[in-house]
Amino acid sequence: MIDTLMVHSVSSSTRNNAQKYSHNSIQGHYHSIFDIVYAADTNQIRWSMTVGTLQDPHGVAARYGEGIILKRPILGIGVVLGREGNYLVISDLHIPYHHRDAFDFLWAVYSYYDCIEILNVGDVIDHHAGSYHESEPDALSSEDEYYQSQKYCKELQSIFPEMTITEGNHDKIPKRKLKSVGLPASMAYDYNQMYGLDKGWKWTERHSFDSKGGQPVLVPMVLNKRGRWDKRVHGQ
C-alpha cells in the first residue's frame, strides 16, 4: 500500500503537513527546518519529515540567507526505516556548492543503515549563476558552474547509480529561464542528458511509495571546529 509522498516542498510547517495529509510526507527546500512531526486521527498515525540541507553553509551560494539569524541552515539528511528495507533521503545538495564532506557523509549513512533505495528531495543542482536572485560576484561563472555541476553529479552517480529525485526550484532554473525568453521549458526536459548522466536517476515532480510501515529518522551532519564532518553517524 502506498503510504508516503515525497516532494521538494509542501509548506514551511512540518506540523501542518502531518495534520493536513492522510499519508506520510517528506520534503526538503527549507534549509533551517530539520524535524519530524506525528499526527493522528481515528484511522491512523502518520508522520511528516523535513530534512535540512547539505549545502556548504559558508559557501558563496549560501550567502543570500546568511544574515537571517533564525534561518541558519541545518546540515543533515533523513532515513526511513521500513520492515523490508531502509530508504536514504538526501536533502538539498545545491551542487557544486555542497559541503565538501557531503558525499562521504551520505555513503557512511547509507552503509550504517544498510539502505536499499536512494531518494532525493531535490535542489540537487544550485544553478547560482542563472538564479533570479542577484548572483554573488565571486561565484563561479555560468560556464564553470555548469562543468563543476557535471563533474560532481557524475561523482555522486558513481556512488548511487540509481536514485529517485523530486525536482526542486533550483533544479528547474534552466526551464524557468527558457520560459523567460519565450522558449518552451520542454527544451530542457532531460536533466540526465543535460549533465551527461546515465539513466539511473529518475526525476519527477512527486514520488509516492510504500514504505512498508516505515518510521523516519533524522541524521544530522555534525561539523567539528574546522567546519569538517566529524566522521560519525548520529541518529535521532
Ranges and model annotations:
Residues 202-205:
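Short acidic-hydrophobic, aromatic-tinged amphipathic segments that line or gate anion-handling sites
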Residues 1, 18-21, 110-114, 157-159, ...:
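Flexible, charged surface loops at secondary-structure boundaries
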